[in-house]
Design a protein with these regions (language model features):
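Interdomain regulatory linker/hinge segments that flank or connect interaction modules
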Residues: 16-68, 147
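Acidic, polar loop-rich interaction surfaces within structured domains
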Residues: 268-271, 279, 286-289, 295-296, ...
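PDZ/PDZ-like peptide-tail recognition elements
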Residues: 52-91
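Cleft-lining beta-strand/loop regions that shape enzyme active-site pockets
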Residues: 5-14, 26, 30, 34-35, ...
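Structural motif
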Residues: 106-108
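Membrane-embedded segments
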Residues: 85, 97-100
Length: 498
């Protein structure tokens, strides 16, 4: 019995050895053993020895990945967080199943189809499995609403829920801001629709494209985004297999923003498809790259079936920027060091990058065997290094603030802001002083910060941002936080100088 690939008649001595070993273990081993599990583990170990981006993906994992990349799943249309051991609704999708049923941000879901969800230390996947299901099936929920101190029941019919990958708003006069969170199947359409909406009442002359923390996605999606920025035929990227088969991808001169000033924001977690976009724009001198050196992933993967619903995400080719540069960083020191280096990219100035033992990617051209280059896309304008301890403090503080906001809003829902989104954005942060004082009183004994007053402005602004998210959606969160964002400030300064 053959347990490993006998593809197209390939039958090497090593493959014979492996199949013989599997058969011996199955038929002659002294104890019963799950041979399928053993083969599964050995397959995973084999794949792990290839490169950092090849991976075994189980049927269950693949389903989750496909939902994210397809841009739709079947559920009840909420985002949630465990706060004080209870499942708290963070946001409700507009016109989604939960909004139609009358669910609000801040509501606590206590029971789903008879299963209690509180005081169980459940992880997100366990919770999701109870809320998701087949389209038009019903989930019975018991919900607690703090504002009226009541528990009530709702029957919610599961439906298709879109997963947005694009956030957009008018940054300032004649200037649009578009955040792309991943390159999914529908990202290109989302981008075009968002741009056209921005362009409706006033022609957009400047565009800030935010690719920070974008891990990549579908290569074709990145190509279609690049295609929006050029008025003549230009190279987007080149791919090449180990056998030297090379494909070149070009723009089509059919984009929605072929003229105008383009600024792309990147950081050390901008990877893969994000780097395709940044590299094409930079090499073709179409725009300005602002930020930190990018991740450095210049390898292309394909999903190939393994059987049983599992797939191998296998690296099948390299890609090069239009000028012929490879951006792939070395992984000769192992996968752990490879990802550690990536995590440090936001915390080193360019002259300190050499301490990471990586060279400049510009030295690597087609067919180069040199794996020890720096990798990534180097920005045209570099943003000053981030302080790790400051970012950790902000991360802890943000978690405290979000927990507070959802609890506070639920307790004060009837007395809170009733105006428009525009009016909300124009509110002074002093409007949130009462909430700030309450937050400070609740958290002053937590020893995480010597004096919360030192962060007063940041806390007030964050309270405003997270309240805005609950009231008006994710765009408001970006609009408020971007007001004090260093990358955005540099982009605006560049626009004003142009």
């Amino acid at each position: 019995m053959n347990y490993i690939f006998n593809y197209l008649g390939f039958n090497s001595d090593n493959l014979k050895k492996y199949n013989s070993l599997v058969n011996y273990v199955k038929n002659r081993y002294y104890a019963d053993i799950n041979i399928d599990s053993l083969v599964d583990e050995s397959t995973k170990e084999l794949i792990q020895k290839l490169d950092p981006h090849s991976a075994h993906i189980s049927k269950k994992e693949l389903s989750i990945i496909n939902e994210t990349m397809e841009g739709v799943f079947v559920g009840i249309g909420i985002s949630f967080k465990m706060i004080n051991d209870s499942l708290t609704v963070l946001s409700v999708m507009k016109n989604g199943p939960s909004q139609i049923a009358g669910i609000y941000p801040g509501d606590r879901i206590l029971i789903a189809n008879g299963d209690t969800l509180f005081n169980k230390n459940l992880d997100n996947n366990e919770i999701i499995s109870k809320l998701k299901g087949k389209e038009n099936t019903v989930v019975d929920l018991d919900i607690y609403r703090n504002s009226n101190k009541k528990i009530f029941s709702k029957k919610i019919s599961r439906g298709k829920v879109p997963i947005k990958s694009v956030i957009a708003y008018k940054l300032m006069q004649k200037t649009g801001y578009i955040k792309v969170e991943r390159f999914g199947k529908n990202t290109h359409d989302e981008f075009i629709n968002s741009f056209r909406k921005l362009n409706e009442n006033e022609k957009i002359e400047n565009l800030v494209l935010d690719l920070r923390n974008n891990p990549g996605g579908f290569l074709f999606s990145a190509e279609k985004i690049v295609d929006q920025f050029f008025s003549s035929k230009k190279t987007i990227l080149i791919t090449e297999t180990k056998r030297g088969v090379r494909d070149t991808f070009f723009t089509t001169n059919k984009g929605v923003f072929r003229k105008g000033n383009l600024y792309i924001l990147v950081n050390g977690q901008s990877a893969s498809a994000s780097e395709v976009v940044a590299g094409a724009v930079q090499d073709n001198k179409r725009g300005t790259i602002i930020g930190r050196r990018t991740f450095g992933k210049g390898l292309v993967q394909q999903h190939l079936p393994l059987g049983g619903g599992d797939v191998v995400k296998l690296t099948t080719s390299r890609y090069y920027t239009p000028s012929g540069k490879s951006i792939q960083r070395s992984f000769s020191d192992g996968n752990e060091e490879y990802f550690n280096q990536a995590n440090n990219l936001n915390y080193h100035d360019s002259e300190d990058i050499n301490k990471l033992k990586i060279k400049d990617s510009s030295t690597v051209k087609y067919n180069s065997k040199d794996e020890n280059f720096r990798g990534g896309i180097s920005p045209d304008i570099q943003v000053k290094i981030a302080n790790k301890s400051d970012e950790l403090d902000k991360s802890i503080l943000n978690n405290m603030i979000t927990n507070f906001v959802y609890t506070y809003l639920d307790s004060n829902r009837d007395n809170f802001f009733k105006g428009s989104k525009k009016e909300y954005l124009n509110l002074s942060i002093d409007y949130f002083d009462t909430a700030y004082q309450k937050f400070k009183k609740l958290n002053s004994d937590k020893k995480l910060f010597d004096d919360l007053s030192e962060n007063k402005t940041y806390i007030k602004n964050s309270i405003k941002a997270y309240y805005g998210f609950l009231l008006f959606g994710e765009e408001v969160l970006y609009e408020i936080f971007n007001d004090d964002d260093e990358y955005i400030k540099i982009a605006i300064n560049s626009i004003n100088k142009s």
